[in-house]
């Protein structure tokens, strides 16, 4: 396992970066955030296909990553949804400035050589 210490340390840094958003951020929510960061302009259908999550799980995570979560709790404000110009009944997703900042921090953590937790 020692051969993999560097890679595992990198994963640890990424997890620590996600934990700055919320200490108990679900993996599904992180996965949805990353999918939107990779492919801005995704629809909920695209996101469900890309992540293999149910439509209910995708919608729950979109709300958590947006302005308002379930039960009117504040969301993380990492993504925003806007009407799709090609089909106005459909919404497409983009990172907010706060989401772009988190994506940049994740990339920085990925490239860092420092041990996790330092």
What are these regions (language model features)?
Residues 85-103:
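Basic, amphipathic "hinge/linker" alpha-helix immediately C-terminal to the N-terminal HTH DNA-binding motif
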Residues 76-84:
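Short, basic, alpha-helical segments at the C-terminal edge of helix-turn-helix-like DNA-binding modules
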Residues 66-73:
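C-terminal flanking helix
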Residues 61:
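Residues within the DNA-recognition helix of helix-turn-helix
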Residues 6-22:
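Short, Lys/Arg-enriched N-terminal segment that forms or immediately precedes the first helix
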Residues 14, 97-118:
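Amphipathic alpha-helical dimerization/coiled-coil segments
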Residues 17-54:
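N-terminal helix-turn-helix DNA-binding core of bacterial DNA-binding proteins
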């Amino acid at each position: 396992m020692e051969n993999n210490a560097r890679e595992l340390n990198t994963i640890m840094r990424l997890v620590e970066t996600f934990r700055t958003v919320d200490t108990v951020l679900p993996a599904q929510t992180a996965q949805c955030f990353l999918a939107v960061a990779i492919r801005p302009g995704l629809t909920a259908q695209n996101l469900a296909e890309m992540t293999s999550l149910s439509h209910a799980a995708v919608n729950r995570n979109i709300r958590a990553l947006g302005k308002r979560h379930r039960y009117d709790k504040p969301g993380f404000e990492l993504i925003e949804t806007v009407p799709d110009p090609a089909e106005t009944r459909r919404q497409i997703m983009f990172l907010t400035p706060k989401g772009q900042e988190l994506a940049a921090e994740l990339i920085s953590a990925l490239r860092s050589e420092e041990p996790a937790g330092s």
